[in-house]
A protein has these predicted regions:
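His/Asp/Glu-enriched short active-site or ligand-binding loop at hydrolase and phosphoryl-transfer sites
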Residues: 292-297
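Extracellular glycoside hydrolase catalytic/binding regions
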Residues: 19, 118-121, 125-128, 132-133, ...
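Active-site mouth of glycoside hydrolases
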Residues: 2-171, 176-185, 193-195
Length: 301
């Protein structure tokens, strides 16, 4: 529990990285724009059917889809090299998908757990030594709400160990339970492994960041917008409340000498005070030395 993570010089000396979550498919214009914006890090999501239950159950079809996504990323990495952009490979849609409760099937079914590890072995063999790849992000926003034979922590550990046997050099990214929530860092233990980066997502408070997402504004009779800073439920949300909500991550960082990566954070465009919320988040990330990628860049195109 008191494990101190160490990093090779290449990672330890790397300055704070700032960037964005990727579109579903890159164009040349996307890369040129990211370069103009001085983006240094992109979290490249391998995803489909977000929000749907019981997807990605046909593993042969899943592998064909995955091969196409990896082919695309390999071409993107080649084109992006001249811009000096680094990428985190993010397995956003793992084999087996999620059930109706949003738990991941692979935590409960050996077939999908085994395939998850095989997927990462394939990715590691393909991208080992690729200068554009900053890290392997094993699974996006794990959710495990009940006891599981292949729990969110141990399955990531097993995949990390499998990757390390193939690629000992590329950093591995681990995520916490509860949608990679900062709150779940209270019970997250570090892997007994070096060169591991720990990721958090920041969408707190959700009633602000996601207000009226999914057309609930019209469905709920045009209730009032939630403003930041301001009272939300029983709490007053401002920069210090954001800091308080992230405290478990900060404690984890200091206790374990961990490099922290904020893989996603955002607020919906129409949220009153969204720019203030983002500014306050980024100022805290920068104060703590956390890498960050904003969600998202041209995701809806």
């Amino acid at each position: 529990r008191d494990y101190k993570v160490s990093y090779p010089e290449r990672v330890a000396s790397m300055p704070l990285l700032r960037g964005v979550m990727s579109p579903h498919k890159f164009t040349d214009d996307d890369l040129e724009t990211l370069h103009k914006w001085n983006v240094k890090l992109v979290r490249a999501q391998i995803t489909r059917d977000w929000g749907k239950a019981n997807t990605d159950r046909d593993l042969a079809e899943y592998d064909r889809w995955l091969d196409g996504k990896l082919d695309h990323l390999e071409e993107v990495f080649k084109k992006a090299r001249k811009y000096g952009i680094l990428f985190v490979i993010d397995l956003h849609s793992p084999p087996g998908g999620r059930d109706e409760t949003r738990d991941m099937h692979m935590f409960y079914d050996k077939k999908y757990a085994d395939h998850f590890i095989k997927v990462w072995q394939r990715i590691a063999r393909r991208f080992k030594g690729n200068p554009s790849v900053w890290a392997y992000d094993l699974v996006n926003e794990p959710v495990q709400t009940r006891p599981a034979p292949y729990d969110y922590w141990n399955l990531q550990r097993m995949a990390a160990e499998a990757v390390r046997r193939i690629d000992p050099d590329t950093p591995i990214v681990i995520e916490s339970n509860e949608w990679d929530s900062p709150v779940a860092f209270r019970y997250l233990s570090p892997l007994a492994m070096d060169n591991v980066i720990y990721q958090v997502h920041m969408y707190h408070p959700g009633q602000f960041t996601h207000q009226f997402v999914g057309n609930s504004y019209g469905e709920q009779g045009k209730r009032d917008f939630v403003r930041y800073p301001g009272k939300m439920g029983s709490e007053y949300w401002d920069k210090e409340m954001i800091r308080k909500r992230l405290q478990a991550v900060r404690d984890f960082q200091k206790r374990h000498n961990a490099r922290i990566f904020v893989g996603e954070f955002s607020a919906i465009l129409w949220a009153p005070g969204a720019a203030d919320y983002l500014r306050d988040c980024i100022e805290i990330f920068e104060e703590y030395g956390w890498d960050w990628t904003y969600h998202a860049f041209r995701e809806s195109k």
